[in-house]
C-alpha cells in the first residue's frame, strides 16, 4: 500500500472514530435499561486505560534500551488494549449515555480541565497513533521515530487522564 492510500485510509478511519464517539456523546439517547454488565464497563474502561499506559511506559523504556522486540510487543499490545477500550467505551455510551459530574467546589475546577484536555487530545491523537503504527509496520523507522516523539507522550497523557476522569466521576464524587 502506498503512502497516499495509507494517509487516506488513516484520515477516513480517524474521522469515523471521532464522529461515532462524538455522535454518541452529543446526540444519542440511550435506549436500554442499565444492567450490572453495563454498570461495570466504566471500571473496565479505566483498567484498559491503565493497562495501555503501562504498556506504553514499558514499551518506551524497552526502545530506550534497544529491546526492539519487547518495544514492538508492548506497542502492539497498547494498540490492541486501546482498541478494546474504544469498543467498550462506545458500547457503554450507546447503552447508558453519559454520566453527569456531580462533584462540587474545588473538585469541579480539577475535573473539567482534565476532562476537556482528555477529550480534545484523545480525538486529536487518533490519526497520530494510526500514522505512527503504519510507519513502524512499513519499516519507515526514521519517520516513525519522528512522529512517535509526539504521539507517545500525548497517548500516555490520554491513557492516564482516562483513569483520573474515571476516579473523579465514579469514585470521588
Stretches found by the model and what they are:
Residues 1-173:
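Alpha-helical membrane insertion/targeting regions
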Amino acid at each position: 500500500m502506498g503512502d497516499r492510500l495509507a494517509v487516506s485510509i488513516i484520515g477516513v478511519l480517524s474521522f469515523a472514530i471521532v464522529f461515532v464517539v462524538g455522535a454518541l456523546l452529543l446526540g444519542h439517547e440511550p435506549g436500554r435499561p442499565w444492567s450490572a454488565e453495563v454498570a461495570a464497563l466504566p471500571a473496565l474502561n479505566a483498567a484498559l486505560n491503565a493497562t495501555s499506559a503501562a504498556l506504553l511506559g514499558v514499551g518506551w523504556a524497552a526502545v530506550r534500551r534497544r529491546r526492539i522486540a519487547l518495544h514492538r510487543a508492548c506497542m502492539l499490545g497498547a494498540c490492541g488494549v486501546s482498541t478494546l477500550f474504544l469498543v467498550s467505551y462506545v458500547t457503554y455510551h450507546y447503552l447508558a449515555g453519559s454520566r453527569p459530574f456531580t462533584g462540587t467546589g474545588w473538585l469541579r475546577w480539577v475535573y473539567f480541565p482534565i476532562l476537556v484536555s482528555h477529550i480534545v487530545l484523545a480525538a486529536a491523537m487518533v490519526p497520530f497513533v494510526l500514522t505512527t503504527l503504519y510507519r513502524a509496520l512499513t519499516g519507515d523507522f526514521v519517520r516513525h521515530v519522528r512522529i512517535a516523539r509526539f504521539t507517545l507522550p500525548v497517548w500516555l497523557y490520554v491513557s492516564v487522564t482516562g483513569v483520573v476522569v474515571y476516579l473523579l466521576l465514579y469514585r470521588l464524587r
